[in-house]
Amino acid sequence: MTGILCFPPFARFFMLLSGCAWLAGVSSGTSLVASAFSDENQLSEFVHVAEIAQIHRNLRGHINSAIIEANDTSEERMQPNNVVGEGKAPSGAQETVAQILVKGMNKVADFLKDLTRSQK
């Protein structure tokens, strides 16, 4: 079986139905998303969910960059020429990592403040 016949009957029906919705949307000059959501409330909820997903990605990016920066600084300070005693980093290295993490969290907090201001 090849082509559309390899799909189960319910999938073929869904593809046919979505194709009809797409054709109806194209023929009336509306966008595909607008034709899929007949109610404006549904469309605004869809946009809201997409915005929330983007916010989560941005927050993850800020947090990950702070962690990467902290790890890089920690690894630089843990080089053999900087080691004090038996494989221990100088006490300043731990403070620096903590300070970098705090800076990263401050960036996240600033991002959230800007976000709440833009939502008002």
Swiss-Prot record:
Belongs to the RxLR effector family. Glycans are attached at N71. It comes from the Eukaryota. Disulfide bonds: none annotated. Secreted effector that does not suppress pattern-triggered immunity (PTI) in plant host. A motif (RxLR-dEER) lies at residues 57-77. The keyword Membrane does not apply. The RxLR-dEER motif acts to carry the protein into the host cell cytoplasm through binding to cell surface phosphatidylinositol-3-phosphate. Keywords: Glycoprotein, Host cytoplasm, Host nucleus, Secreted, Signal, Virulence. It comes from Plasmopara halstedii. Residues 1-29 form the signal peptide. Induction: Expression is up-regulated in spores. It is found in: Secreted; Host cytoplasm; Host nucleus. This is Secreted RxLR effector protein RXLR-C26.
